From Swiss-Prot:
Keyword Membrane set for record: yes
Name of this chain's protein: Auxin-responsive protein SAUR63
Primary gene name: SAUR63
Stated role: May promote auxin-stimulated organ elongation, such as hypocotyls, stamen filaments and petals.
UniProt record similarity statement: Belongs to the ARG7 family.
Localization per record: Cell membrane
Main localisation: membrane
InterPro entries linked to this entry: SAUR_fam (IPR003676)
Keyword terms, alphabetized: Auxin signaling pathway, Cell membrane, Developmental protein, Growth regulation, Membrane
Tissue: Expressed in hypocotyls, cotyledons, petioles, young rosette leaves, apical portion of inflorescence stems, stamen filaments and petals.
A matching Pfam family: Auxin_inducible
Length: 141
């Protein structure tokens, strides 16, 4: 897992690179929102899903281990973006579900199960010779 300090540094670097080509305008505060606007509220970071939906999260979400794992997976799959947004290899429905779990302050067991589910699902998309040795589990809440 990535420690919080390194993750904050990575997020700041991504934000700075993304901000080079756009102006920032403040708007009403919201904890998580989707938008087609190219501006982002101060104290938030933006990610895009695999289906091109834009999500803005408060920086405080970076301390959540599930969000850290998603960013780590994104970095492994897509690398650090030099130009353009951070893209997560998940669809918007999954990210909306994850946001609801985070907002409800999921307990430690749920968080561990979600992390296991993410890594299992990720392994199932790899070629047969590179598959992980973990067994797949279905996560239902």
């Amino acid at each position: 897992m990535i420690n919080a300090k390194k993750l904050m540094k990575m997020a700041k670097k991504w934000q700075q690179r993304a901000a080079l080509h756009r102006k920032r305008i403040s708007f009403q505060r919201s904890s998580v929102f989707t938008s087609s606007s190219s501006t982002v509220e101060k104290g938030c970071f933006v990610v895009y899903t695999a289906d091109k939906i834009r999500f803005a999260f408060p920086i405080s979400y970076l301390s959540n281990s599930v969000v850290q794992e998603l960013l780590k997976i994104s970095e492994e799959d897509f690398g650090l973006p030099t130009e353009g947004p951070i893209t997560l290899p998940f669809d918007s429905a999954f990210l909306e579900y994850l946001v609801k779990l985070i907002q409800r302050r999921m307990d430690e067991d749920t968080e561990k199960a979600l992390l296991l589910s993410i890594s299992s699902a990720r392994c199932s998309f790899q070629p047969q010779e590179q598959q992980c040795s973990t067994t797949q589990q279905l996560l239902v809440f």
